[in-house]
Design a protein with these regions (language model features):
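Terminal-region recognition feature
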Residues: 1-233
């Protein structure tokens, strides 16, 4: 167990993340809820009572959330959280819940590389939607530890973007985007068992899958069903 301030000190001291960006991440996470409020939890311990936002409390149990668009702020915080949890215990698994429409590929690659780099297995769970870069991160979870809730949706598609400027600048942008697309398809091929050519074909347009279809495709390993014990309680 560790207090919320301990992570802030780690992120600011070891990862160079500013206090402002930490606050922005907390605000962005809070705004993903319809009431724009982050729930708080009262944590009672011997000789001490503290109040934590629910996401910080869940991180104490090694549960992380990607519940927004992928951008540089979210990427930096998630990378710092992964590295922090590795420093606390390099052998205990980490769970990452994903409900994201995707976003910046470059920033998403930072999260992906950190997931592969840290010692603990990072299990992934889709709740709601994992689209675009969100689908890549879902598939990037540890083998046999990738799952989705029954009514989740997963979507893969080709890289999107625009170009402007001089012809030389546009040529550079095109080559960069082409290289990035190949990296993404190779990552998906690695984690799904599909060929590069199959991924390229299936990603030509928005390719939406239900949870069971995502499992069949190799993006996840399990569809999490309702616990039968709850019905008998």
């Amino acid at each position: 167990m560790f207090p919320k301030d301990e992570f802030r000190k780690y992120a600011m001291g070891h990862q160079g993340i500013s206090s402002l960006n930490l606050d922005r991440f907390e605000n962005a996470t809070a705004q993903s809820f319809t009431n724009s409020l982050t729930p708080y939890v009262i944590e009672e311990r011997q000789m001490n009572v503290s109040v934590l936002d629910v996401f910080s409390r869940l991180m104490m149990d090694r549960i992380l959330f990607l519940g927004t668009d992928v951008n540089y702020q979210v990427s930096n915080i998630l990378q710092a959280q992964l590295l922090f949890l590795e420093s606390v215990d390099p052998k205990r698994d980490i769970q990452m819940f994903i409900n994201s429409p995707g976003g910046s590929v470059i920033d998403g690659m930072g999260i992906y590389d950190t997931m592969q780099y840290v010692s603990p297995d990072v299990g992934t769970i889709c709740t709601g939607m994992a689209a675009s870069m969100g689908a890549v991160l879902l598939a990037a979870g540890a083998a046999k530890k990738r799952s989705a809730l029954p009514h989740s949706r997963v979507m893969i598609h080709q890289l999107s973007g625009g170009m402007r400027g001089t012809f030389s600048d546009m040529e550079i942008s095109y080559n960069f985007s082409k290289q990035l697309r190949e990296e993404l398809y190779n990552i998906l091929a690695k984690h799904t068992g599909k060929t590069f050519e199959q991924i390229e074909k299936d990603s030509d347009r928005d390719n939406w899958m239900r949870a069971k279809e995502a499992k069949k495709y190799g993006l996840i390993d399990e569809v999490l069903e309702r616990n039968a014990g709850k019905d008998n309680a």
